[in-house]
Amino acid sequence: MPVFHTRTIESILEPVAQQISHLVIMHEEGEVDGKAIPDLTAPVAAVQAAVSNLVRVGKETVQTTEDQILKRDMPPAFIKVENACTKLVQAAQMLQSDPYSVPARDYLIDGSRGILSGTSDLLLTFDEAEVRKIIRVCKGILEYLTVAEVVETMEDLVTYTKNLGPGMTKMAKMIDERQQELTHQEHRVMLVNSMNTVKELLPVLISAMKIFVTTKNSKNQGIEEALKNRNFTVEKMSAEINEIIRVLQLTSWDEDAWASKKDTEAMKRALASIDSKLNQAKGWLRDPTASPGDAGEQAIRQILDEAGKVGELCAGKERREILGTCKMLGQMTDQVADLRARGQGASPVAMQKAQQVSQGLDVLTAKVENAARKLEAMTNSKQSIAKKIDAAQNWLADPNGGPEGEEQIRGALAEARKIAELCDDPKERDDILRSLGEISALTSKLADLRRQGKGDSPEARALAKQVATALQNLQTKTNRAVANSRPAKAAVHLEGKIEQAQRWIDNPTVDDRGVGQAAIRGLVAEGHRLANVMMGPYRQDLLAKCDRVDQLTAQLADLAARGEGESPQARALASQLQDSLKDLKARMQEAMTQEVSDVFSDTTTPIKLLAVAATAPPDAPNREEVFDERAANFENHSGRLGATAEKAAAVGTANKSTVEGIQASVKTARELTPQVVSAARILLRNPGNQAAYEHFETMKNQWIDNVEKMTGLVDEAIDTKSLLDASEEAIKKDLDKCKVAMANIQPQMLVAGATSIARRANRILLVAKREVENSEDPKFREAVKAASDELSKTISPMVMDAKAVAGNISDPGLQKSFLDSGYRILGAVAKVREAFQPQEPDFPPPPPDLEQLRLTDELAPPKPPLPEGEVPPPRPPPPEEKDEEFPEQKAGEVINQPMMMAARQLHDEARKWSSKPGNPAAKVGIGVVAEADAADAVGFPVPSDMEDDYEPELLLMPSSQPVNQPILAAAQSLHREATKWSSKGNDIIAAAKRMALLMAEMSRLVRGGSGTKRALIQCAKDIAKASDEVTRLAKEVAKQCTDKRIRTNLLQVCERIPTISTQLKILSTVKATMLGRTNISDEESEQATEMLVHNAQNLMQSVKETVREAEAASIKIRTDAGFTLRWVRKTPWYQ
C-alpha cells in the first residue's frame, strides 16, 4: 500500500496515480460499456522508459551502498515494478491487435496497480535508507553524551565542547530538513519540539559539567548536587534524542504509542505523589484532635485525586476497583472531618472511621502500584520488541549474519509472550501465542540453513523474508493488545469532551467504543479535582453537580444497555444530563478561573527569594534554615503552578495544541524544580564561587522562561474577560481584608493585602500587554493600552500609601489615603475589563409614541389608472418547495440499520431548515442572528426571514446500500458542524456541506456498492476540489483576522487539508484498481480500505476544525476588509 509521509513521495505518486486513474476508467468503459480501448503503446512506452530509469538508478544505489537493509529490500521492489511494467506493455500490444481483448484489460488493471504499488515501495525503501543516515548521526550524539560522565578536568571539558558542537549542528540541520519534508503535522511538531529542547539543554549541560569539574577539583561542598544536575541534563537530552529517533521512523500518526508513553509517566508521577503524602495523611488520621481542613486532610484529598487519575487510565475491573475505593474513602474522610468539626474526633465511631480510612489508603496504594506496574511492563515490552525486531531485520538482511540475530528474535518473542500473559482478552492472547509458535519454527529452520552455509540460497532468502513479515505482524498484534488494555480515550480538551459526550447523549444506542461515557467521566474527574482544593459549601456544591452528572449518565447507559435508548424516559434523561453537564461545565470554569487568578498572580517571587537565600553571606544568621524553608516554599509553589495549569488545560477553552503545550511546560517545570534547588544549594555551599553563581542563574532563567511560557498558554486556555472579572473580585476581597487589618491594628495583615493587590494589578497588566501584542486591531489596541497605562500609574501610589499606613496604622488620614488609592486601582481595573467588552451593536431608534401620530379620517388618494389598453399580469404563485419524504422500508427488505438511521437523521436535519410555510423552523425566524450580543455576525449583514437555506441534496445520502460506517461517521460529524450555520453568504460552510455529502457518497462506493471505478475516482477529485476551496477561503479569512493567535491556529489547521485531499485521490485510485477484482487478497483489499478510512477521517476532522477556527477568526475581522463571510446560526443558542 502506498504511504506518503514525505512531500517528495507524495509529489511523485500523485501524477502516477492520475495517469493510473485514466487507465482504470478506460478498463471499466471497456468492461461495462463494451467500448474499444484506444492504442496505448505510446503512453505505455513512456511509462516503461520512466520505470527503467527508476530501476537503473535504484540498482546503482544498491551496488554502492553499505546499508544491508537497503540491499535486501530493493530487489523485491524492482521485481514488482518491472513485472507490472511488463504487464502494461503486454496489455498495450494485445489491445493494439484487439481493442476488446478481455485478458488485455485484466493485464491493464493489474499492471496499473502494480506500477503504483511498486513505485511506492521503491520510494519508501529509499526514504527509509535516508532516515537511517539521520539516525546514525543521532546515535553518534547519544554515544558521545555518555562521555560526559568521565569529564573531570577543564581541559577535558574544553575538548568535549569542541567535539560535541559540530555533531549537534549537523544533527540539527538534518532534523530541520527532515521535518520540512514530512507531511504529518504531528510528526513535524514533535521533531521541532524535541530538537529545540536539545538546543536549550546544551548550555545547561556545559554549565552543569563545568560546576561539577569545579567542585570536584576544588574539593568544595555540593559535588553530589552538581552530579545530579549533570546526570539529569544528560538523561533529559538522551531521552529527547531517542524520541527524535522514534519519530523519524514513523510513517503514520501513532496516537496509541504516544498515549501509552504519557500514561506511564502520569502513573509514575501519581504514585510518587501518593508516597510523599501518605505519612502526613496517616498522621492526621491518627490524631483525633487534628483540625478538619488542615494539611493532613488535604494530603488525603490529594492522594485520592492522584489515585483517581490512575483509575481513569485503567480499564475493566482494575478501573472499577480503584475508582470505587477512591469514592468510598472520600466519603469516609468527609465523615471523619465532620465528626471532628463537631468536636467528636475522639469518639469510638470517629476513631474507627479514621482507622478504616488509613487501612483503605494502604489498599488503594497497592492497587495503584499494580496498575502502574502492569502498564509499565506492557509498554516496556512493546518498546523492547521494537528495538529487538529492528536488530533482527538487520540480521535477516545479511545472509552471513552470526547467531546474535537469532537471539534478538528469541528475545522479541519472550517480550511478546509477556504481553500475551497480561492480556485480558483470551482471543487476543491466543492470537499472539500462535504467532510466536510460527515465528519460532521459521527462525529455527533459517538458523539451521545458515549454520550449514546455505544462508544465501533461494530457500533461505525466502525464509528470511517470511520471518521479517511475520515479525512485523507480531509487532502489530502486540501494539494492538497494549492499546486495547487502556480505556477508550476522551479528547484532551474541554470542548472535545463536550462534543464526544453530546454525540453519545444524542444517540446512546450507537456503539462509540465507550468514548462518550469516557468523556463524561473525564469531566466529572476534573470536577472532583477542582473540588478537592475548595472549602466548605463550595466544594459540596461542585461535588453534588458531579454526582448528579454521574447518576444521570449511569441511568442513561443502563437504559441503552436494555435496548431502551430511544424511549421517552431515555430522551427525558438525556435532556436532564445535557442541562446538568452545561451547569457543571460553567461551575468548573468559574472555579478554575478563580484558582488561576489566585495561583498565577505571582509566579516568580518564590524563586527570587530562593536566590536571595542562596547568595546570603556566610555569617548570616540561620542561613541553612532560611534556605531550606525557601526551597520548600519554591517547590510547593512550583507544584501548585503545575497542578493549576493542568486544570486550566482540562477545563478551559483551549484547543488541542494549547493543551499539549501546557502539559509539556508542566512536565518541564516538574523536572526543573529539583534541579534549580540543587543548583541553589551548590551556590549556598560555595559562596562567592563564580561558576556556581553562573550555573544557578542558568537553571533559574530556564525555570522562569518555562513558567512564563506556561503562564501565556494558561492565559490562552481561559477566557480573558473571566480572568479579569475574577482578578477584580479578588482585589475587592483584598481591600476588605485591608480594612479589617486597619480596624484591628494589624500592620502585617495590611501589608500582605496591599502586596496581593499590587501583584494582581501587575498580573492584569501582563494579560493586557499580551492581548495588545496579539491583536492588530488599532482601536482595540489603543483602548487596552490607554486603560493599562492608567492602571500602571495607580500601583506605585497605592504601595507608598500602604507603607505609610503600616508605619502609623491608627492615623485616619493615612487610612483614607490608602483606601482612596485602592479604589483608584479598582476603577482602573474596571476600565481595563471594559476595554475587553465586545461592542454592543447600534440598535435602531425606538418607534415614535403612538399618541404623537396624526391620524385623520381622510382617505388616501386613489391609485392612478393604468395606461389604456394594458392589463396587469397576474402574480405568479410562489415556487412550491418540496420536502421529499424519506423512503420507507419495504416489506421483507433487508437494510443496513445503522446506515438507514444515519440517513434518516440527515434527512430530518434537512427538513428542519426548510422555509416552507407551516414549517416550525420558518415560524421561529430562521436566518435571524441568534446570539444576543451579535458576536457571531459582527461586520456581516443580517439576512431576511424569508431566505431559503434548504438543501435538497442532503436527501441523496445512501439509504439501503452497504457502506463503510467509519467514513460515513466522519462525514456526519462534519455535516453536523456545518449545519449549525446558514450557508447563505458563507462559501466555507457551503463547501464543507458539499464535502460531507461527497464523503457520504464515497462511503457507499468504497465497498463497491452499486458504484463504479469512475465514480469513486471522480468523487475523490470532487472532494479535493472542495478541499481546495475551503483552504483558499480559510486563508482569506486568516489574512483579514486581527487576532494573531487565532490566525495562526486557522492557518495551521487549514494547511493540513491540501496534503490530505491529495492523498485521498491517490488512495481512491488504489482502491478503484481493486474493485471487482478476484485476484486481490482480502487482507490487501482491507488494508487499502483502512488507509482510505483513516485518510477520510483526518480530512473531515481538519475541515471541521477549519470551520470552527474560521468562525472564531471572522469575529476578529478587519473593519475595512473587503472579504467577508456571513455567520448566522441556524439553531439559536437559547433553544
Swiss-Prot record:
It is found in: Cell membrane; Cell junction, Adherens junction; Cell junction, Focal adhesion; Cytoplasm, Cytoskeleton. Exhibits self-association properties. Part of a complex composed of THSD1, PTK2/FAK1, TLN1 and VCL. Interacts with APBB1IP, NRAP and TLN1. Interacts with CTNNB1 and this interaction is necessary for its localization to the cell-cell junctions and for its function in regulating cell surface expression of E-cadherin. Interacts with SORBS1. Interacts with SYNM. Interacts with CTNNA1. Binds to ACTN4; this interaction triggers conformational changes. Interacts with FLII. Belongs to the vinculin/alpha-catenin family. Residues 858-888 are annotated as: Disordered. Pfam families: Vinculin. The modification Phosphoserine is found at residues 97, 260, 273, 276, 291, 347, 435, 575, 580, 601, 722, 796, 810. InterPro entries: Alpha-catenin/vinculin-like_sf, Vinculin, Vinculin/catenin, Vinculin_CS. It comes from Sus scrofa. The keyword Phosphoprotein applies. Sequence repeats lie at residues 259-370, 371-480, 481-590. Residues 861-877 have a biased composition (Pro residues). Residues 259-590 are annotated as: 3 X 112 AA tandem repeats. Residues 880-1135 are annotated as: C-terminal tail. Residues 2-836 are annotated as: N-terminal globular head. Phosphorylated; on serines, threonines and tyrosines. Phosphorylation on Tyr-1134 in activated platelets affects head-tail interactions and cell spreading but has no effect on actin binding nor on localization to focal adhesion plaques. Residues 742-765 are annotated as: Interaction with ACTN4. Its main location: membrane. It is a peripheral membrane protein. The modification Phosphothreonine is found at residues 605, 673. This is Vinculin. One of its GO terms (cellular component) is fascia adherens. GO terms for molecular function: actin filament binding; alpha-catenin binding; beta-catenin binding; dystroglycan binding; structural molecule activity; ubiquitin protein ligase binding. Keywords: Acetylation, Actin-binding, Cell adhesion, Cell junction, Cell membrane, Cell projection, Cytoplasm, Cytoskeleton, Lipoprotein, Membrane, Palmitate, Phosphoprotein, Repeat. Residues 1004-1047, 1121-1135 are annotated as: Facilitates phospholipid membrane insertion.
